[in-house]
């Protein structure tokens, strides 16, 4: 298993609407394993494939971070949602920044697991928020897109400087 490079905003690939996975095979399972490795290495609780420059509809989640409650959602689709909530969200692709994002309190999602079997999941709390955040990534939406243009621009400028500093070192 290999940790992958996480793209940093404003990378254009983070704004792409991802293609569905047509077949869950060993190559997809390898991507899933690498995504989990990357997510844990970066201390995240969720990761969407476009964040590691794989433009397919794949999500890995472990809100507990204990590797005991891992979720793989391939081609996820929210079927139902209810309630209103929101927390300050962070993102591995937007390091050092957090913002309050409006989300649904509960979601029902349908997806394929790592073996290609369809399942339905009822989620609430942090898991529901994480699912919504990661599905946004699959649709080319980042949490900064919920912010005012001025706040979004300030974050963009700071991260461009950050990326230049990283490139020099």
UniProtKB/Swiss-Prot annotation:
The record's free-text note on cofactor binding: Binds 1 Fe(2+) ion.
Functional description taken from the UniProt entry: Removes the formyl group from the N-terminal Met of newly synthesized proteins. Requires at least a dipeptide for an efficient rate of reaction. N-terminal L-methionine is a prerequisite for activity but the enzyme has broad specificity at other positions.
Keyword Protein biosynthesis: yes
Database matches in HAMAP family: Pep_deformylase
Active site positions, chain numbering: 134
Protein name, per record: Peptide deformylase
GO MF: metal ion binding; peptide deformylase activity
Database matches in InterPro entries: Peptide_deformylase, Peptide_deformylase_sf
EC id: 3.5.1.88
Lineage: Bacteria, Pseudomonadati, Pseudomonadota, Gammaproteobacteria, Pasteurellales
A Pfam family assignment: Pep_deformylase
Family in the record: Belongs to the polypeptide deformylase family.
GO biological process, alphabetically ordered: co-translational protein modification; translation
Cofactor requirement: Fe(2+)
Keyword presence, Cytoplasm: no
Source organism superkingdom: Bacteria
């Amino acid at each position: 298993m290999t940790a992958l490079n996480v793209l940093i905003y404003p990378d254009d690939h983070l704004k792409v609407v991802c293609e569905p996975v047509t077949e869950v095979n060993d190559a997809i399972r390898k991507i899933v394993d690498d995504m989990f490795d990357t997510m844990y290495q970066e201390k995240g609780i969720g990761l969407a494939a476009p964040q590691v420059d794989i433009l397919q509809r794949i999500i890995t989640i472990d809100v507990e971070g204990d590797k005991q409650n891992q979720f793989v959602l391939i081609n996820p689709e929210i079927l139902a949602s209810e309630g209103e909530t929101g927390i300050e969200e962070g993102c591995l692709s937007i390091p050092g920044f957090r913002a309050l994002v409006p989300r649904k309190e509960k979601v029902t999602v349908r997806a394929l697991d790592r073996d290609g079997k369809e399942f339905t999941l009822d989620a609430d709390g942090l898991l529901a928020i994480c699912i919504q955040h990661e599905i946004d990534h699959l649709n080319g939406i980042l949490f900064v897109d919920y912010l005012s243009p001025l706040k979004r621009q300030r974050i963009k400028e700071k991260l461009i400087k950050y990326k230049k500093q990283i490139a020099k070192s």
